[in-house]
Amino acid sequence: MADIKKSSLELIGGTPLLEAARYSKKAGVEKATILAKLEYLNPAGSVKDRIALAMIEDAEKSGKLKQGATIIEPTSGNTGIGLAAVATAKGYKAILTLPDTMSVERRNLLKAYGAELVLTEGAKGMKGAIAKAEELNQEIEGSVILGQFTNPANPAIHKATTGPEIWKQTDGKVDIFVAGVGTGGTITGVGEYLKEQNPNVKVVAVEPAGSPVLSKGTPGAHKIQGIGAGFVPDVLNTKVYDEIITIENEDAFAEGRAFATSEGILVGISSGAALKAATILANRPENEGKVIVALLPDSGDRYLSTALFNTQN
């Protein structure tokens, strides 16, 4: 009876690392090891639970967020779900602005946690959602924008939790870390921590081929929800990664499906992108015998209406 959690917030973090042997075999990987960090096992279903709790608690400690206040956040989905869940658990109201291109499942999840949604024009991307959030912040007294793209608590929580978890789980035997870049918090925090432990760890950023902002400075439309915000976020440490791999929409979809049908685990579109990058790295001759950790941000059940799984339409 001693190991009983008192709050859903205590369940955030500590996600498992899976050796994706069946997926690797299906992907033709023979000479490197791919490990998948399964972030969908956080209580609200994604890696963003970590930053939702961290940003809210940071705002509470600084006095910026007071009891009964409204939390406003521009989000492409998962941060909003995490914030809606944490806000509910802590007694805050949440208003979330997001592009109308986000999946129906994500919108319904946000509503299910009690959040109010304000949809913005999809073509304007996250910039449109950010502008709307700032407008609402001016209108609603006592409201707070936590600002995942600019908030130092975002990368800090990954440096404090996700990075150390990976290091401990691999017993320090991680050679390459692969992560998609949305806000840049995950790759910044984890990358900095791993490189502090071992400067030889290679950190690889993944971005959509349709919006290669980091590699070519060119924003554009793409279908890999959760990464490729269309600009370089303030919290992203652009010196932490050693390489950028761009992934096509269809490759992200294909690898997400391949993981589901090999490992029996549904993962999201950005997870498919990270897996594709991991297989590219694993099949390079110079990476023979190396351990590659790919961070898989969320579950595929958030994308059943998208081209990831809805292949009949």
Label each residue range with its predicted role.
Residues 1-313:
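PLP-dependent amino-acid enzyme catalytic core
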